[in-house]
Amino acid sequence: HLVIRRQRQMCIRDRNIVEELESNDARINFIYTHLHKIDLELKKYGSSLKVYYGNPVDVFREICRKVTVDSVYTNHDYEPYAINRDLGVKEVLQDFGVPFFTFKDQVIFERDEVVKNDGKPYTVFTPFKNRWLLRFNETECKVNTNSNFTNLKKSNYPFPNMEDLGFSSSPIQVPEFDLNKVVDYDKTRNIPSLDSTSKIGPHLRFGTVSIREIVLKVKDVNSTYLSELIWREFFMQILWHFPHVVNQNFRAKYNCIQWRNNEEEFKKWCNGETGYPFVDAGMRELNKTGFMHNRVRMITASFLCKHLLIDWRWGEAYFAKKLLDYELASNNGNWQWSAGTGCDAAPYFRVFNPSEQIKKFDKAHTYINKWIEDLNELTYPQPIVDLSLIHISEPTRRSY
């Protein structure tokens, strides 16, 4: 949120969100670094950024009591918590007679802008994508290049140290994104040993790059890459129209799936100790870097849900803690896709065999050897499950 009394710049870090994270969470470090950059830029114009830390509703109430606020501007957020938070902020502002303006920002199309002819939301990706492209080609997409900072409020707020906010440095750094990787994305995207992905996820997630700028740059470069950006918006509109997916299956008929939920097996999956190299390499990469190649994400998710028969919500929550590019909509949508419980999901009989996947996408074990140093040592664990025995009971099969 930015609170503006004419040209006064303020930012509120939401305690309800950050208190659930480790103090050295790399994403908090990333946000802090970019807020500091904003503050330094403002100081060039004799202004500064005031940083608050707390419950946003309480902070806004306190601000309105202390200073005169003309209006508040913020961007739309489509997660249920954020929607309720912003409604609470709006109510507080109304008590003080302060207008509350919200805007679309993190997507090209939102909410009801890409729907069926009858106004209902799409629940299958391909027709959504086709309508999205049709609308995009009919819409003038512009990048705001306004750089007029002459009317900023003069201020010199001290920028807080990370420690003052209760955080500490992280050993994990968010990498810079590289759009040069987009050119051959369709040819290289499934090979995890290649450094062939743009790493743009965290930057889209935290708004350090404009989705409009990115789409305009890649739309004529690689259609496969553009499709991935459209998938992101597809899952966002699913979350908007069907908020129950946060904690429930998209399709209620799968609520009777009999998850085994073996805690010891889940722990081994988290630690990359399943005895299946492709799965373990992915989990070890995630734990060390906050990143996992998309092909490997599908393999690890399928293994957890369809070989170990552990509830997708367990895996979704673990990824939420670790992924630098974590977005609720995409994370939830992809996990439900892998489990077969979501919209446009992989059916129960589609199982990513991690051993067969090696033959297709890491035949020389280049990726695996990078992340599993003890692959051929006695210390490497034995497989925790027989791949020939997929844990789908007959009642569970019937539920599908």
Q: Positions of the model-derived regions?
A:
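Trp/Phe/Arg-rich N-terminal binding region typifying the photolyase-homology
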Residues: 5-9, 13-136, 221, 284
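Active-site-proximal binding-pocket segments
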Residues: 196-369
